[in-house]
């Protein structure tokens, strides 16, 4: 083997060795964090039943894939997305099912105040926060 071939082989080995160890690293990292409770926040700011159904589907899928006991899921509604949480909501039964399965559904009180909605206008068992966007941030 000449010097160029040897240098090339050595360089290839150096460059690929970190890549070859990635699957082992990923497995170690995954097993390390498997006992850590995950947190997911889904924001909905559209008054569109299709988008709400998508958000609810995503939340349910996360619960199924990760496990209800391993993840905290919160759906935060504000702005135009808030009225879908009213008592006459076309997705009210799905929201109720999500809440019953442990998904926290949160309504923005700023939006409620600006749209003159009260807690009496809203679906039961919702959580409330002063402002929706900061809730997503934390």
Give residue ranges: language-model regions:
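Bacterial N-terminal signal peptides that target proteins for export
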Residues: 1-10
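Intrinsic disorder/low-complexity signature
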Residues: 1, 22-25
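Secreted/extracellular ectodomain signature
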Residues: 24-138
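Bacterial N-terminal signal peptides
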Residues: 9-21
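Contiguous hydrophobic segments
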Residues: 5, 14, 77-79
């Amino acid at each position: 083997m000449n010097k160029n071939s040897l240098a090339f082989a050595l360089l290839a080995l150096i460059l690929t060795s970190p890549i070859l160890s990635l699957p082992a690293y990923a497995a170690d990292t995954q097993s390390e964090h498997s006992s850590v409770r995950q947190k997911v926040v889904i924001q909905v700011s559209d008054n569109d039943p299709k988008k709400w159904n998508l958000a609810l589907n995503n939340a349910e899928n996360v619960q199924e894939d990760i496990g209800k006991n391993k993840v905290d899921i919160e759906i935060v509604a504000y702005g135009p997305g808030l009225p879908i949480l009213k008592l006459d909501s076309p997705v009210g039964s799905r929201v109720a099912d999500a809440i019953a399965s442990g998904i926290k559904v949160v309504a923005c009180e700023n939006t409620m105040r600006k749209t003159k909605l009260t807690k009496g206008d809203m679906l039961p068992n919702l959580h409330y926060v002063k402002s929706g966007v900061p809730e997503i941030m934390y």
